[in-house]
């Protein structure tokens, strides 16, 4: 019980420290695009925790970014929880019942590597965020140029690379050990 409590406290700290780094450190970097640090942390949470905690993390980021960071009205408040739930459909661990069902239907009944799913989750979430942003720009009657799409792809790649770098320390901080291989589990 005590371990579960401290794991929740660590999750809360990671979410809030990630928000603080996003609004302080990431805005000071001298780059043309901003790395979306909340999506990096959400991708680690989505892969490591159940769906309701992914929604909780997305809701916290949505509320904080909506109230503290000026931008498109209600975009962050709506986007982050929906994105967390949508990405959790594809990137969370399969339940034991789902694994058993897959194996009974002669399919591959196993989860993919967390070290593959985390960057893919960050990439998909960032591409979704950039697509929503580009659609909003197009709806506001602005002319879309190739610079918008170049920045969107650059942001997606930089966010994915940041997820690759930060997933190991974040997983250790959140209390996830290295995945156990089948050979180690048997022996």
Question: Language-model segments: which ranges?
Answer:
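Terminal, non-globular segments
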Residues: 1-187
